[in-house]
Structures are given as structure tokens and as C-alpha cells.
Amino acid sequence: VPATFDGKYHTAPITLSQYETRVCARDTKTGEQAEMLLYWLPDFAGKYRVSLDDNIWFLRELAEHDYRSIFECAYLAFWKELYDEFGTKTHINIYLKDDDDFTIAALSDRYKAEWQANSHWLRLSFHARANLPAQPYLNAGYDEMKRDVDAVRAEIERFAGKELLGPVTTLHWGDATVEGCRALRDAGYDILLADFNPPPNNYPVAYYLTSDTERLHLFDRFAWRDTKEDITFIRCAIIANCYQEEEIVPFLDQLARDPHRGAFIDLLIHEQYFFPHYQFYQPNYRDKMRTAVRWAVENGYEPAFLEEIAAKW
């Protein structure tokens, strides 16, 4: 396809009709050429989801109470309210254990049928072995990551069912070695989310992506695929517990005005701020997330899990 030059850029129209397209730009005078891969996700734009990090306390509550339904747990009941009202799909990243003596092995499978019946709007995935230490997988190798991810996935399948699993997760602290990410990928997680903070931020939260170019690309465009490792990285849009309630809508409005950053909206919040016993409890936790979800719906975003819109096809 011949390109035209506008004094600054060479441009040419091309049609994307498949997931992966290799594009080659060639100088017909010198023979010099450059190639790149383009990925087309036709259903990616205009979608949103809720994602929850650091989850373990609600699971301990389920284990310690004789509830007739998982939705007698106030935490899960709130997310069901959002589903019932807006159709919101919620992705929950969980720990294997808490900071005391509880592990998810103590969960009964008595609610398994109910988990499965709600799998059209709920997901459970591996987050980490536990909340502490911070940055637990910063230097972890393949075997350490595999040990923890396999343990959590096995428990999810046991007490909730494989229907709740999927190829997407957010790793605790979002820092890992390439070997650790290979273990995640081999366990089934080939779509990874994080903050991907731009330099010179001291906490990249960017898995093994250490170059400024990769981090800036993800910060500005919200998606990048490592073709060598067969892993797709996606940036979350907002961490709601870090914002005042009145700041949420203006922040999301700003994102939506940028077509590169506002295509898919991941509304992230952490579990602990929901619970009154937590020292940094946020009484308006529900209001924050209802505000964020209502904004998404009123701005035309539809609920979707990432495996429905970002997986290879």
C-alpha cells in the first residue's frame, strides 16, 4: 500500500481483519524497512469491569459463619447489588492465607453450586500467598511462583469450581521476574494487570518490564503484548481507595477523553478498606464504587471480563 507524506509522517490505510497482523514499512528508494505486530481487539473498547485486590477477609468470614448463602456476607452482597443494578462483572484476586492462621483450605465446598451459578459475573484468581511481605515476588523464580499459584488455583476449583477461573489476574504489588511470569502464564494466566507507573516512580508495579519505553507505553496506552513471552499486559484505570469520592468522576472523565487510555476501564479497589476493623477503613467504600460504576454505565461502557475481550481469537 503506497504511503503519503504530510511533511511530518508517512501514513497509509490498512485493514485489520485478524487478531495479529504483521506490518512492514519499506523505503522503496533505499530498501530499508521496519516491521511491527499490530493486535486487534474488536470488542475491547467501551467495556469495563470491577477488580478487587488483597482479598482474604471475606473468605475467612465465609469459613467461620454458617451462612445459607455466600451473599449473606456483606462484602459479596454489595458486589451482587452492583450486578443486579448495573450488570457489573467483578473479578476477585485472592490470597492463600491471612496474616494469622487461616488458609482458604478451611473453606467448605458447600457453596460451590452457588459460586458456579454466579460465574457469569464473578471471577476468582490468584493474587499472592499472603499480604506480607510486600513485593513478595520481586525476586521469585519459576518454582516459587508455581507453588503459590497452583495452591490457590486448586483451592478455587475445589470450593468454587473451575467456572470461576480464567486467564486473567493482578499479582500482589505487580512486581515479578520474567521466570515468575512464565509460571503465571503456564498456570493459565496470560493477561496480567498492574499500575505500570512511569519513570522516575520508585515503584514501577510493572512485573519484569523495566525499560522506560515499555512502562511509558503502558502508562499512556493501557495495553502492551510481549510477543516473546506470550503475555498481554493491561493497566488498571483507577485505584478507587486512593481517591476521595468527589475526585473519582473528574478523574474518569479525564481518562475517557483520551482514546488511548479510556478504551477499557478497570475499576480497582482493595478489600481491606471495606471492613470497619481495618485501621484505614473507608466508610464511603460502597459510595465510591457505586459512583465509579454509575459513571461507567452512564458513559456507555458495558460490563465485560477481560478474557471475553482481550484474549487471543
PLM features per residue range, with description:
Residues 4-10:
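Aromatic sugar-binding surface patches on proteins
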Residues 13-20:
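Surface-exposed, short loops/turns at beta-strand junctions within beta-sandwich domains
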Residues 25-27:
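Conserved structural position at the C-terminal beta-strand
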Residues 35-118, 165-167, 267:
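Active-site beta->alpha N-cap acidic-glycine motif
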Residues 77-88, 101-127, 185, 221-227, ...:
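Acidic (Asp/Glu)-rich catalytic clusters
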Residues 89-177, 200-204, 269-275:
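Metal-dependent polysaccharide deacetylase catalytic core of the NodB/CE4 family, i.e.
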Residues 101-104, 163-164, 173-266:
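Active-site-adjacent pocket scaffolds in enzyme catalytic domains
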Residues 192-196, 264-313:
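C-terminal domain-boundary segment and adjacent tail
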